[in-house]
């Protein structure tokens, strides 16, 4: 039986931030959504990629599922008016086009910072989630390993990722262009937060404070990079003394509001 590898894609290229925020999936939500797709549709492979700039659902199926996938995703996120949101999505229903699109996404060609080095890790985590859920068949396994091999060749054999090849590098670049010898506070020490910290240290910034909801992670990063630890409870005090605050916290609601900043 013939099958089609297809994708529905919501990205910064067509959707504003307010829309992307509503539809973005946390890691736990992505896992739950994959099980929903499995329950509703006959798919042999399923991959869900969701970051701050994109939410994409790839499936391999014997029938076209793109419109149904979008509707299911919107319902899953509590959005009932699918007609309003359909124009924000890009759809690829041809297997060759979908494969090419995934290759381009995985190598960072479609990232806001072209060549973003964090994208391959995001794709790997999405693939691991598919494998853990028994939703990666022979086709997806072979495709993903081919993509990882291609990514390795890009990194080793080309200069594609030279320069500001990540959001974290671009953030540190912007910070240093705004203030001379800034006092910087980094809030959140996930992959991006740690990368920002490393980039700033590598570029000679000496006054860096860091804080994280998990104390252990803060101490580990501080010990590795020589940054000053700020207790999470003292976040507002540290903000008031900082020239620049860089946040990479994953939350459903904003951590920093206009009202909170006004009270500093």
Name what the model sees in each region.
Residues 1-111:
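A glycine-rich (often HGG/GG-containing) alpha/beta subdomain
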Residues 28, 32, 64, 68, ...:
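Conserved active-site and cofactor/substrate-binding residues in soluble primary-metabolism enzymes
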Residues 45, 207, 226-228:
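Conserved beta-strand segments of alpha/beta enzyme cores
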Residues 84-180:
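Glycine/serine-rich phosphate-binding loop and adjoining beta1-alpha1 elements at the start
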Residues 222-264:
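Rossmann-like adenosine-cofactor binding region
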Residues 147, 163-168, 172-201, 205, ...:
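Glycine-rich adenosine-cofactor-binding loop
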């Amino acid at each position: 039986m013939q099958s089609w590898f297809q994708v529905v894609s919501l990205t910064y290229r067509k959707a504003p931030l307010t829309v992307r925020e509503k539809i973005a999936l946390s890691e736990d939500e992505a896992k739950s959504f994959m099980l929903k797709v499995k329950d509703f549709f006959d798919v042999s492979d399923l991959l869900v990629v969701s970051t701050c700039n994109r939410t994409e659902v790839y499936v391999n199926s014997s029938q076209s599922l793109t419109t149904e996938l979008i509707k299911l995703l919107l319902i899953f996120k509590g959005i009932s008016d699918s007609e309003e949101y359909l124009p924000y999505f890009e759809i690829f229903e041809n297997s060759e086009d979908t494969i090419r699109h995934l290759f381009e996404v995985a190598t960072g060609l479609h990232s806001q910072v072209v060549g973003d080095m964090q994208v391959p890790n995001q794709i790997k985590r999405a693939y691991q989630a598919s494998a853990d859920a028994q939703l990666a068949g022979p086709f997806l396994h072979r495709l993903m390993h081919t993509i990882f091999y291609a990514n390795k060749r890009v990194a080793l054999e080309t200069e594609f990722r030279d320069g500001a090849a990540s959001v974290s590098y671009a953030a540190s670049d912007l910070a240093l262009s705004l203030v001379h010898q800034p006092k910087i506070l980094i809030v959140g020490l996930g992959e991006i937060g740690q990368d920002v910290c490393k980039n700033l240290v590598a570029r000679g910034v000496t006054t860096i404070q860091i804080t994280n909801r998990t104390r252990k992670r803060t101490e580990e990063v501080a010990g590795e990079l020589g940054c000053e630890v700020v207790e999470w409870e003292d976040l507002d005090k540290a903000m008031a003394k900082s020239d620049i605050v860089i946040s990479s916290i994953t939350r459903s609601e904003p951590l920093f509001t206009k009202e909170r900043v006004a009270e500093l």
